[in-house]
Amino acid sequence: MHVTVVSPEQAVFDGSADAIVAPAYDGQVGILPGHAPFLTLLGVGVLQVRQGSASTRFRVAGGFLQVVGGGGGGETVRIVADRVDAS
């Protein structure tokens, strides 16, 4: 699935991922290929973008996460955070 992570200042990640773990406003959410279309508000915490055995981490605060095009692995995950820092 294709993932973009942006803040008001910059795009911090644009690439493919096997899994995402994100801090939603009411608890953590996991996104895998084949996930249904989805929209949630982000809370404060660590966002993990997993690519095989590697994991890229960002500290995020506020914003939203959207999954579009759910189904056969062609999803796009958009993460627009009010604040993003490398973790």
Predicted regions and their residues:
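Compact, glycine-rich, soluble single-domain proteins
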Residues: 2-87
